[in-house]
Structure formats: structure tokens, C-alpha cells
Amino acid sequence: MSIEKTLDELKKQLNYHAYRYYVEDSPELPDAEYDRMMQQLLLIEKEHPEFMTVDSPSQRVGGEALGGFTQVQHEIPMLSLDNAFNDNELDSFEKRINDRLISDSVSLFCCEPKLDGLAVSLLYVDGLLVQAGTRGDGATGENITENVRTIRCIPLTLQGEGWPTRLEVRGEVFMPKAGFDALNERALKRAEKPFANPRNAAAGSLRQLDSKITATRPLSFYAYSVGIIEGGELEGSHYQRFVQLKNWGLPMCEETKQCHSLTDVKAYYKDILERRDALKYEIDGVVIKVDSISLQEQLGFVARAPRWAIAYKFPAQEELTVLNDVEFQVGRTGAITPVAKLEPIFVGGVTVSNATLHNADEIARLGVHIGDTVIIRRAGDVIPQIVSVVEARRPEDSKAIIYPTTCPACDSQLERIEGEVVTRCVAGLVCPAQRKEALKHFVSRKALDVDGLGDKVVEQLVDKEMVETPADLFKLSAGVLTVLDRMGPKSAQNVVNALNKAKETTLSRFLYSLGIREVGEATAANLALHFQTLNAISSATFEQLIEVSDVGDIVAKHILGFFSEPHNQAVIENLQLMGVNWPDIKALDESVPQPLADKVVVLTGTLYKLKRNEAKAALQELGAKVAGSVSKNTDILFAGEAAGSKLAKAEELGVEIMNEEQLIEILNN
């Protein structure tokens, strides 16, 4: 293909996807793919300037205005930003600006997170908000004044004094993660299609023709620059302008800071990247700006972006790949999970070849076929998932995904209980797949913690029909274990020793090891502390069970069902006959004041000085109820390093947040 034809095809594709992104709010490509196409276009135009045209996507920003809104003209164009994708490109940015300044050099930068929302312009005249517009194509946007007036954090009248007669504030409208989750939860309850991501939700909410709908959406706003300034002056520092705007009532991102060198900028980037998942909003990089306004003016602009700013993008969290097949896996409780087998793709810092498809409803919602090009997303430690399908790229030989009616492991009939989204194999431990997963759970670190008995060993034990129930594990001898692959006499004896050591456990660990549906570590600990004996738990009524913290109607029914099953009773009896035991739990002395009595607390993140289980036990001794998730009933969140979505939700709900040092101080006192 000739260079001209390549350029034409790139322009056509970029224009099409810009329209899908900016106008229809229904992007088909992940941002990283669009960025790559744009970088390819820029490179070709740089090498062959004779082929550059005025209608090239490199010469404009965004898309056309929607027909449903009146238009606003931007007196000062609302431009986009050039991107950097690595440290070398950031170094080149610094060199470019310093080479252009010649006599001056940049010694101060203003850095802020790059919010993933919708750029807007707010015009204040005599302190009153008179107009709000989208960026549109940079020169012309959509008049969204009535919708913006519904966003509570945007002042309709500026506070304080000293603001210019005409002041244009530019910033990003976005939807916080917690608000996005709540919005989608409501949509699902009403059987409506949920939004794909917070950016789409923010854009869709802001572009409602009925502002009453916008008013119901949890939108927020951060200022990031100014445009028109008439009848007054602002500070000569970009950062200090943020402070001015904040004093006048306009929100400023709390992560904005000044950096005194490019080394500081790189450290800032790394810090924000590491804390990305804990922030209460979606970001896709950081924006670095020359802090001095006079130097900004000297540097000026190119056609589509300022020379004095750059967006340092994070590694892509979304990428395009192909769905090659779907494998149906059987979990410990019989749940059938469809797993997408993908063409390997590097995304979110790792190579991904598998992704969850959750259940039959999710497959139907996505409308995905084997052979489809799909958008895969991996954020933080979240399991990779398919978020959408590029239907325009569907091949003619694509195949619909057929959900199984019988168990792929034991051929038993599958069942789906009314009101549940999960399809299950109800064969229990008769099913080899469930048996494997149940035994893996039983010996896991948070359960009986049997060192040396890993997943591969458990799978061999089941495949060779050496073990059927958890009690059978304690009948194994070193001699028997040596028949397994890669299991020598010394390793075999170590496993036997670990099994004997695991017999001495705690009631909460034992309860957790049994694999009762929806009974996690925290719930098991709360049950043990509340009832104090296994007999009391197994004979508890529904009414008694729901008195326990973290135990609702559904969990109570699972517990009742588990202990009423004769097979489960036999498993517990055999385990005790094999010597599995635990110390008695001492009842709390109610005469002694409990500093955290009836407080609902949650632990999240990495603790360096405390073991998580020890911290939980100590908190419970102080009267706290340790929950597994943050809700409006949570009193305190103890957040370690790299705390993620729980921290964001706690901040959104106004929950008290303490760090590990404060936790240790409470425990010591």
C-alpha cells in the first residue's frame, strides 16, 4: 500500500473512531489502540509533510457537536495534549521546551492526574456562571449550561473577591468510582443496560437533553486551566492559579503538586501509578505542565496542543485481542465459570491469555462469539475481563458460545436456581473438579495452611483416586505420597509433618476450611467468636445466625443447609476422629470495657508489621466486628499499603480511615 493510501486509511479510521468516542459516546477501540494509530499518522506526516492536509485528525481535536444542543464558540481554542509513553519521551519533552526557550530553562513543573472524563469550559461573568460548553472540536462545542448547573460541586456564583470580570475556567467532568458502581447497580436492578466505564457514564450523563436526568447522576468536576481572563489578573504560576480558583469555590484535584525537576516529575508519576487503584476516580496518566505562565506564553502552541504541557500516559489497561475459545471451569461450590481463551496480549503490565466471562447472562449481554475481536481490560489486581466486542471486525466463521447443560467434569446435569446468575453442578464431592477445588481450599494458607500440599499435588491425589474427602488427607503416609510426580521421600515426609501440624488449628480456620458458601475469613471468625463452639454453630437456628455480624439471610441459609447435609456431618466427624482440634474460645468478660465494642471495621491493603489474621483476632478481642467489605455501616477502615477499591469506597462514604501505625497504637493501648 502506498504512503498516500496508508494515510487516507489512517485518517478514515481515526475520524470514524473519534466520532464514535466524542459524539456517540460509544467507542469501539481502547484508548491505547487509538493512540497508536494517531502516533503512526503523526510519524508518517512528519516524514512526509507534503501529504499533510488541513482535514487531518492531527490538526484538530475531538469530534463534531451534537445536533441536539446549541453550539458555543471557544474564543480561545480548547486544545488536546501531546502524549509521552515512556521516560525517554518525557526527557525529549523537557529538551524541546528548553531548546525553544534558549535563555531560560524550566525549573518548576505543575503535575496532576489525567482524569478520564469530559473536558468542559465554564464562563463566569461578574462572578456568575453564564455558560458551560464541551470541548467539541476545539473551536466549537455544545452548550451544556443547564446540565452543568446540576453538578453540585460547580459554583453558580464565585466566592470571595478579586476574580476577573470575565473568567473562563476549564476542567474535567467525571464520575467517581463509587458513584459509577452505584449507578450501574441501580441500572441492573431496573433491567437496564449498565455503562461500560465511568468515562462513558460521565459523558452520557452530561449530554442528556433533559437536565433532570443529569441531576440524578453522581458527577463531579476538577478545574485544570483557565481560558479567557478579562477585567482582572491571575497569578503567574499555574499551580497558584489552582489555589486562586479553589479560593473562589472551584474544586481542585488534591493530588496536584509542584515538581522542581524532571526527576521529581518521574517520582510523582510512579507514585500516582502505584496508587491509581486507590484513587476515587479513573485516571489514565498524569499531566505535566510548565508552571510559569510567562514561559507558557513564550512556548506557545502547535496546531492541536500546547508546547508547554504533555500527558504522560500509564501502560494501557485495555487492549484489543481475539477470543479463540471458551473453557467452562467447575469451582469448589459447583459454580460453572466460562473462561475466555485469548490470543496472548500485553495489557496492564502483564501478558494476558485468559479472562473471565462470569456467567451465561454476561455472555448474552456482550453478544460475544468465538473468533470475535474483543476489548480486554486488566486494572490492578482485578481478574482480566472482556468489556466489549468490536462487532465490525466479526469474521464470517465466528461461532456462537453454547453454554453447557451437563457438567464438563462429571457429566451431571447442571442447575440454575431461580434468582441466581450462576449455573451449578450439584454433584458435590462426587464431581472430581469440585473435589479438587474443595481440597485445595481446605489446605490453603487461610484455612488449615498445609505447607507443601500445593494445587498440583492435590490434583494428582484426586486423579489417582488416593483422596476423596478432607479426612483422607490425614491417612496419607510418606511412602504412599512418593508415588506422585516430583515427590521424593524428604518432600513426602515434609507433607506428612505439615498435615500433623495442621491438626492443631482454630475454630474460625476450621469453619473457613469447610468451604461453606459465602462464609469467608471474616464471617468464619465472627461465627466462632459469637457461638464459641462448633456444636453451637451447627445447631443454631436461622434467627440465631442472623444475629451474627456479616451474616444475612442468604449466608444463614447456606450455613443451615451445609450443617443439615449428612455427608458434611460425616466429613466433620471423620476430621475430628483423625485428630483435628482447636482450643476453646473464652467468652468475653462483659464487665471489662471493650474500646471497639460493636464497631464494624474492615482491613484492606498490605500490612507490614502485623499479620492480617493476627490483626483480625486482636480487633475482635477488643469487641470489633470485622467485616469483609465497606458499606454505610462501616465505622473504621484500617488501610495498609496499596489499598484499592475499599479505600476509595470508604472515602466516598465518609468512613473513618486509619493506617497501620494507628491500628498498632489502638491494639497496644
Curated annotation (Swiss-Prot):
Segments forming a coiled coil = none
Q: Which Pfam families match?
A: BRCT, DNA_ligase_aden, DNA_ligase_OB, DNA_ligase_ZBD, HHH_2, HHH_5, Nlig-Ia
Under catalytic activity, the entry for this protein gives: NAD(+) + (deoxyribonucleotide)n-3'-hydroxyl + 5'-phospho-(deoxyribonucleotide)m = (deoxyribonucleotide)n+m + AMP + beta-nicotinamide D-nucleotide
Gene Ontology molecular-function annotations:
DNA binding; DNA ligase (NAD+) activity; metal ion binding
E.C. number, please?
6.5.1.2
Q: Which Gene3D superfamilies match?
A: 5' to 3' exonuclease, C-terminal subdomain (1.10.150.20), 6.20.10.30, BRCT domain (3.40.50.10190), DNA ligase/mRNA capping enzyme (3.30.470.30), Helix hairpin bin (1.10.287.610), Nucleic acid-binding proteins (2.40.50.140)
Residue sites binding NAD(+) per the record: D31, A32, E33, Y34, D35, S80, L81, E112, R135, E172, K289, K313
Cofactor(s) recorded in Swiss-Prot or TrEMBL: Mg(2+); Mn(2+)
List the InterPro entries hit by this protein, alphabetically: BRCT_dom, BRCT_dom_sf, DisA/LigA_HHH, DNA_ligase, DNA_ligase_AS, DNA_ligase_CS, DNAligase_adenylation, DNAligase_N
**Active-site residues?**
K114
Which residues bind Zn(2+) per the record?
A: C407, C410, C425, C431
Keywords for this entry? DNA damage, DNA repair, DNA replication, Ligase, Magnesium, Manganese, Metal-binding, NAD, Zinc
Q: Which residue intervals define the domain BRCT in the entry? A: 591-669
**GO cellular component labels:** cytosol
Per its UniProt record, what CDD domains does this chain match? BRCT_DNA_ligase_like, LIGANc
**Entry keyword annotation includes Magnesium:** yes
Task: Report any one BP term from Gene Ontology.
Answer: DNA repair
Q: Which domain of life is it from?
A: Bacteria
Please name the NCBIfam families in this protein's record. Answer: dnlj, PRK07956.1
Report the function annotation for this chain: DNA ligase that catalyzes the formation of phosphodiester linkages between 5'-phosphoryl and 3'-hydroxyl groups in double-stranded DNA using NAD as a coenzyme and as the energy source for the reaction. It is essential for DNA replication and repair of damaged DNA.
Per the record, the similarity remark reads: Belongs to the NAD-dependent DNA ligase family. LigA subfamily.
State the name under which the record lists this protein.
DNA ligase
- Report which gene this protein is encoded by: ligA
